[in-house]
Amino acid sequence: MPSSRTPSPIGPVLLWMCGTLLSFSLMAISVRQLSFKLALMEILTIRSFSGVVILSALAVLRPALRRQIRSQRLALHAVRNGVHFLATYLWALSLTLLPLATVFALEFTAPAWVSLLAVLLLGERLSVSRIGAVVLGFIGVLVIIRPGVETFQISTLVILLAAVCFSVSIVTQKMLTQSDTTYGILFIMNAVQLPMALAGVYFMGEFDFLLRLDATDWLPVVGICFVGLTGHMCLTNAFRAGDAIFVVPLDFLRIPLIAFVGYFLY
């Protein structure tokens, strides 16, 4: 049944998505740089731990934020963060296996899954133009992976699975914006995913991973600490301002940006 919501305001959505685009592009570059020294679980530990520390510091400075951590939808938070952690791990893994532009291009099968889930779970409207955009996106993916030819890489399946997981995470995140604040969603995300990352580090038995870093590695570490937060803050606020079906396709703008950066860096 079509949603009765008014059309999404384009201005705020575009502004928040510009922040999302820049943050996640910098995140990808930082992860790729650190992957030469650190395992993926160690990188995810840095991201979640720094998120908890920064958000806790904000709560100390602004005590009113503490009330925003409470949520009546903890089960939905658990589902969202479990799926998101898996998606993030697969995404980070794909960054070590494939060129940056290829990773981002294949990641953008997510809008198709988001469109379907948003219609089924959120009651959003799937227009003809949006269907066309989804179809064109899938055609682009087929051009990139070229299934059935020699150039096909099994590693492309890693990012395709990550895209499916991200789509579930995106729709549940949109659902959470209907009841929870941006601060609360971010704090719970980092607090839930930190033990998951630490468990991975524990099984590897290497808690001294920061000692392997030299002076040149700390810039991407700082990048992960901050853009890991700003990316999700901007994306959450974009979902608060507009429909998921409208917001997610704007992320396609990351492809030319990361292709340009990847060409000069790698």
Segments and roles (model prediction):
Residues 91-93, 110-132, 256-266:
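C-terminal transmembrane-helix exit sites in multi-pass transporters
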Residues 103-109, 176-192, 232-263:
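Helix-helix packing/entry segments at the starts of transmembrane helices
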Residues 21-29, 56, 81-89, 111-116, ...:
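Hydrophobic/small/kink-forming positions within alpha-helical transmembrane segments
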Residues 37-86, 165-168, 188-205:
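Transmembrane alpha-helices of multi-pass small-molecule transport proteins
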Residues 2-5, 52-72, 139-151, 194-217, ...:
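Membrane-interface helix-cap regions at the ends of transmembrane helices
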